[in-house]
Amino acid sequence: MTQSAPEFIATADLVDIIGDNAQSCDTQFQNLGGATEFHGIITTVKCFQDNALLKSILSEDNPGGVLVIDGDASVHTALVGDIIAGLGKDHGWSGVIVNGAIRDSAVIGTMTFGCKALGTNPRKSTKTGSGERDVVVSIGGIDFIPGHYVYADSDGIIVTEAPIKQ
């Protein structure tokens, strides 16, 4: 028996449901993907101006997963471009949240794939494979914990321990 994916709940509605304890990200990300609402189980990666590890992660099948990428808020180089976003989409990921920059934003904006980032930069990142996977990353006053759940839309980002039912 296949379990269906949890229903998307708008982040503003989640705050109303959860109340004052809602884990809302303070960082103001831009919606740059074609899917402006996305959600899923969190996978994390910390990488500074190097995207080889995150490319490897997005090459893995993860239906409905969301990769949270902590690039230490650097917009000096892009961590995600159209090829890497396409890999994620093709492997079932619902989207990425990039604490850094992306490139190829016009193409990514046409994909049915969620992408929130601080901004854009056409400069490529290095590809040495440095970084850490499945570690707690703290962005915008909240912790993104691997295995927890994230909801993202045009109002912001909410993290919960598990999917919320309406």
UniProtKB/Swiss-Prot annotation:
UniProt-listed Gene3D superfamilies: Ribonuclease E inhibitor RraA/RraA-like
Catalytic reaction annotation: 4-hydroxy-4-methyl-2-oxoglutarate = 2 pyruvate; oxaloacetate + H(+) = pyruvate + CO2
Any one GO MF annotation of this record: metal ion binding
Enzyme class of the recorded protein, top EC level: lyase
Pfam family name, one: RraA-like
Cofactor: binding comment: Divalent metal cation.
Binding site for substrate: G81, D82, I83, I84, R103
Key words, A-Z: Lyase, Metal-binding
Domain of life, per lineage: Bacteria
Binding positions for a divalent metal cation per the UniProt entry: D104
Gene Ontology biological process terms, A to Z: regulation of RNA metabolic process
Cofactor requirements of the protein: a divalent metal cation
Subunit structure: Homotrimer.
UniProt record similarity statement: Belongs to the class II aldolase/RraA-like family.
Protein name: Putative 4-hydroxy-4-methyl-2-oxoglutarate aldolase
Species in which this protein is naturally found: Corynebacterium glutamicum (strain ATCC 13032 / DSM 20300 / JCM 1318 / BCRC 11384 / CCUG 27702 / LMG 3730 / NBRC 12168 / NCIMB 10025 / NRRL B-2784 / 534)
